Amino acid sequence: MKTIRAQMAVLGFLLPLVLSAAAGPDFGQTVRNFSANRHKLIQELAARLNLPLPPEAEAFFQAALAGDWTAVSNQLAQMQAQDPCQARQPALMNELWAPIHETWGLYEVWAGLKEDSELMAKFTEPILDSMPAGSIYFGGTDAGRFAVTAVNDLQTPPPAFCLTQNGLADNTYMAYLREIYGKRIWLPAPEDSNAAFKQYVDDVKEGRIPTGADVEIEDG
């Protein structure tokens, strides 16, 4: 009986370890690590570009580092415009907004997937594993953008250049990409980007809308 009890005790001790190993990495820690990564990045950008970092931004990142979802949401509400992709504060209408937006976006994806680490791994790993090092990755959906960017950028060195096509008409986002990627990839100059966007707008106004495009015109 003593031998059986001893074996059961050992099994009871080992079973949680086996289950823990099978569960894989905790993506919640990835969220916090990415928050630290973007906190460092926004501080570097502020120093390099001589831009003041508002206290609300610092409070946002402190909440993110602590993994406090409610505080993260409350702090973001003080900085975010009606358009969730844009800043409300003039001090953040520049390269500093993207690290905040990317951090918040990852938190939203993580919460939306019910904090399921296994599901996050099944989503992100095949995408990154399918690309050779040095690839340029365009993330269109929130999960495709924020989750993949986080997993990619926490690797040393990051294997891919992650960006979103949804932000390419935004001059502040393009300026952000130029700062973080520099001359490692080609990016259009501001005047070229603006000219391309103007051409697209002109085409839409003339009725030359690409097949399958979803275009809405507001206020003329």
Place the predicted regions along the sequence by residue:
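Bacterial N-terminal signal peptides that target proteins for export
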Residues: 1-11
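Bacterial N-terminal signal peptides
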Residues: 9-20
